[in-house]
């Protein structure tokens, strides 16, 4: 890495002795500058419509702050950005915003770009401005911020945001170089600017000097501009804060790396920037725009454009408002349209054919060339490379263009990068000297675009990967934090309950569950260890019996006072006998079911209990049968009143028989308590419920 102090030493040596160095390669094409630099810069009439592109610099477009239908003034801000790479654009005149839509761009592709279309009102009315006389009343930060807000970018061709360059160079600048070389043929806009606006240009340079605080300031101008050199030297008489250095005419001496090499003899390493060597470089047009912004309070809304070529009769340099259609400029300088010959934007070495003359003037537009048949010939057909090495000899960056050509054709991106394609400054020298008419610059630009696309895809993939990993880490962290919070809350609750009750509730609950399971296992296990399902069987039978009882229909029950017919009374008596008998049988069956379940405890007692149950059930059945006989005898009475009385007596006796059957179930349950109190209680309860329900049903039927 080159020491900035060495650069400063070489510049001071140049200042004292005038010593200059050179760089490898380069060419000396015909200049063709005299046809346009003989007249002062002039202004033209304004067009009816302006087409202001939202992107006119090396960076990104800002956010629109106007809408269709808004009335805007000259110099009013149309977009705003969030950082220095988002330069705002401003209205070139006063008028109405009639559209915001894609419009053909001043680019080789001609692809549409978002454009603000303004219809002029003819007043050309400025916004409110606040000019100042002395820039020393502002701080460096205030100047940088104003340079940004007023949309100033490098006007030498790269259009890099000036505020960004100034902020990056803070406290590192040793040498400030003002580039007035203007080495490309035909272009004379900087030449005329230095001649016609010398004082304002020097004021802009002093503003840069105030912000950057360099130790030396040098203005470099090619020696084919004697009038510009003389004008600046005359203005600098008696001043010692900067000096002018004339350099030999050679293309591309105006490129930043080559100009540094001429002035210092030091070559900037590949991949490094001039600021890393303590050097900051600005174009003369940029310095002039800074003066207009800081002193006059005017944003960048116009620039000097060279109009030249044999198809233009009134050649020269003009003030062109940004957004002016190029065809409007050409019509005012007597352009003779000819479809056989294209119009170029830029110089003959780095420029391109305009896809449409409706394209607007932007901050990059420094020259418009309209050639005739003496200046322009259709491109020769491309031939095979003969490996003559002319391109390598002429390359000012010491690259191997013929090798890069093969790599570009094969789309071997890795090899292209290994051979430093990124160091190519696209000056066009290699294509100029190629005897095979190979458009090398086109190949190199396409290869750079492809490499950039691959890198952007890789960058996006890496960013997506990082976002995914960050998301996973965040989710895992949130999960761990949530688990920790839940655990802490549970521990806190247990501690609080333990303090209030003296025991851990969770542990106590677990102990209760364990004790309950042990008790259940003890109850449901026989003496021999086999499982005891008798209780479940009893409950199942009881549920079945209850279901059968529920299915008995209780309809067609005649009121007691309606049984006046002897025949009906006889039928009722028969039904009563049947129901009583069925009740006795169910009671006998219940006793029989309960008896086997209790045999495990004491077989003898179970047998006695079963015998008693059967005896009592027979007695209840006999009583029910006797009751039915009495009812039948009584039904023989022909008197309806007596028949009704007999039926009522039959119902009462049937009800009494059902109650006795219920008592039998109770006694059986009581006797079985010796074997198993729990099972006996369950069986007795079920028996009572069933007997009572059956008695009620019989009473209703009678």
Curated annotation (Swiss-Prot):
Translocase found in the keyword field: yes
Disulfide bonds: none
Binding of [4Fe-4S] cluster 1, residues: 385, 388, 391, 434
GO CC list: plasma membrane
Required cofactor names: [4Fe-4S] cluster
Keyword 4Fe-4S carried by entry: yes
GO molecular function (one): 4 iron, 4 sulfur cluster binding
The record's free-text note on cofactor binding: Binds 2 [4Fe-4S] clusters per subunit.
Location(s) in or outside the cell: Cell inner membrane
PANTHER family noted in UniProt: ION-TRANSLOCATING OXIDOREDUCTASE COMPLEX SUBUNIT C
Primary role: Part of a membrane-bound complex that couples electron transfer with translocation of ions across the membrane.
Summary of subunit composition and partner proteins: The complex is composed of six subunits: RnfA, RnfB, RnfC, RnfD, RnfE and RnfG.
Protein name: Ion-translocating oxidoreductase complex subunit C
Species of origin: Haemophilus ducreyi (strain 35000HP / ATCC 700724)
Gene: rnfC
């Amino acid at each position: 890495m080159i020491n900035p102090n060495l650069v400063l030493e070489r510049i001071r040596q140049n200042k004292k002795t005038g010593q200059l160095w050179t760089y490898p390669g380069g060419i000396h094409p015909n200049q063709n500058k005299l046809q346009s630099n003989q007249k002062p810069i002039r202004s033209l009439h304004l067009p009816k419509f302006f087409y202001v592109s939202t992107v006119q610099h090396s960076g990104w477009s800002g956010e629109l702050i106007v809408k269709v239908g808004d009335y805007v003034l000259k110099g009013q801000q149309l977009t705003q950005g969030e950082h220095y790479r988002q330069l705002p654009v401003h209205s070139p005149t006063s008028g109405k915003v009639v559209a915001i839509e894609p419009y053909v761009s001043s680019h080789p592709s001609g692809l549409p770009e978002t454009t603000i279309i303004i219809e002029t009102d003819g007043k050309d009315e400025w916004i409110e401005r606040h000019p100042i006389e002395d820039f020393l009343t502002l701080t460096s930060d205030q100047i940088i911020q104003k340079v940004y807000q007023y949309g100033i970018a490098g006007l030498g061709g790269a259009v890099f945001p000036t505020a960004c360059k100034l902020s990056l160079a803070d406290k590192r600048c040793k040498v400030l170089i003002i580039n007035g070389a203007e080495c490309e043929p035909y272009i004379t806009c900087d030449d005329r600017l230095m001649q016609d606006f010398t004082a304002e240009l020097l004021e802009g340079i002093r503003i840069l000097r105030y912000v950057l605080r360099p130790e030396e300031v040098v203005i470099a101008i090619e020696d084919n501009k004697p009038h510009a050199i003389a004008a600046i030297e005359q203005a600098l008489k008696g001043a010692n804060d900067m000096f002018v250095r004339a350099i030999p005419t050679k293309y591309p001496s105006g490129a930043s790396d080559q100009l540094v090499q001429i002035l210092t003899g030091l070559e900037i390493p590949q991949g490094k920037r001039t600021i890393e060597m303590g050097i900051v470089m600005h174009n003369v047009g940029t310095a002039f725009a800074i003066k207009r912004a800081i002193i006059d309070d005017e944003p960048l809304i116009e620039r000097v454009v060279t109009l030249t070529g044999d198809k233009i009769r009134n050649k020269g340099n003009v003030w062109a408002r940004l957004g002016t259609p190029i065809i409007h400029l050409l019509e005012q300088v007597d352009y003779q349209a000819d479809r056989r010959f294209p119009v170029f934007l830029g110089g003959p070495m780095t420029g391109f054919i305009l896809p449409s003359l409706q394209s607007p003037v932007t901050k990059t537009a420094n020259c418009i060339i309209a050639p005739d048949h003496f200046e322009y010939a259709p491109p020769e057909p491309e031939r095979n490379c003969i490996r003559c090495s002319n391109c390598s000899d002429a390359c000012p960056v010491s690259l191997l263009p013929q090798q890069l050509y093969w790599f570009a054709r094969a789309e071997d991106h890795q090899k292209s990068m290994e051979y430093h394609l990124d160091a190519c400054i696209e000056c066009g020298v290699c294509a100029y000297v190629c005897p095979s008419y190979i458009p090398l610059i086109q190949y190199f630009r396409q290869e750079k675009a492809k490499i950039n696309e691959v890198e952007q895809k890789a960058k996006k993939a890496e960013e997506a990967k990082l976002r995914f990993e960050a998301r996973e880490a965040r989710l895992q962290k949130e999960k761990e934090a949530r688990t920790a919070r839940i655990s802490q809350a549970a521990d806190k609750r247990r501690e609080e309950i333990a303090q209030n009750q003296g025991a851990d509730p969770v542990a106590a609950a677990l102990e209760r569950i364990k004790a309950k399971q042990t008790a259940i296992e003890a109850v449901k296990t026989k003496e021999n260890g086999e499982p005891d399902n008798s209780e479940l069987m009893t409950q199942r039978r009881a549920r079945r019996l209850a279901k059968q009882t529920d299915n008995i229909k209780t309809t067609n029950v005649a009121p007691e006072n309606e049984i006046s017919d002897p025949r009906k009374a006889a039928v009722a008596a028969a039904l009563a006998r049947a129901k009583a008998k069925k009740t006795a049988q169910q009671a006998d069956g219940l006793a029989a079911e309960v008896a086997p379940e209790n045999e495990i405890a004491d077989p003898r007692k179970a047998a006695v209990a079963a015998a008693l149950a059967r005896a009592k059930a027979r007695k209840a059945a006999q009583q029910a049968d006797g009751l039915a006989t009495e009812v039948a005898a009584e039904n023989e009475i022909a008197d309806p009143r007596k028949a009704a009385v007999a039926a009522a007596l039959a119902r009462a006796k049937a009800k009494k028989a059902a109650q006795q059957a219920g008592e039998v179930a109770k006694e059986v349950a009581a006797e079985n308590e010796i074997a198993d109190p729990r099972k006996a209680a369950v069986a007795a309860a079920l028996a009572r419920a069933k007997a009572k329900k059956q008695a009620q049903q019989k009473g209703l039927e009678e």
